[in-house]
């Protein structure tokens, strides 16, 4: 079984963890932005079927 020869430094661990977290953050921001544009009707690349509701008065 392969075993690392030396211990990974704390700074390298933090760099890798921050990079991993940043990828998730960017994906979340992009998803939120797409959801916002779809809900407001300003989306140009995402097609959603519009439904209308009738209210009885």
Curated annotation (Swiss-Prot):
One GO BP annotation of this record: translation
Subcellular location: Plastid, Chloroplast
Keyword Zinc: no
GO molecular function: structural constituent of ribosome
Main location class: plastid
Coiled-coil ranges per UniProt: none
GO cellular component: chloroplast; large ribosomal subunit
One Pfam family hit: Ribosomal_L32p
Keywords: Chloroplast, Plastid, Ribonucleoprotein, Ribosomal protein
Domain of life: Eukaryota
Family: Belongs to the bacterial ribosomal protein bL32 family.
Name of the protein: Large ribosomal subunit protein bL32c
Source organism of this protein record: Amborella trichopoda
């Amino acid at each position: 079984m392969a075993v690392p020869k030396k211990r990974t430094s704390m700074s390298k661990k933090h760099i890798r963890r921050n990079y991993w977290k940043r990828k998730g953050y960017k994906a979340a921001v992009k998803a939120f932005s797409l959801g916002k544009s779809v809900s407001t009707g300003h989306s140009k690349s995402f097609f959603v079927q519009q439904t209308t509701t009738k209210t009885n008065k």
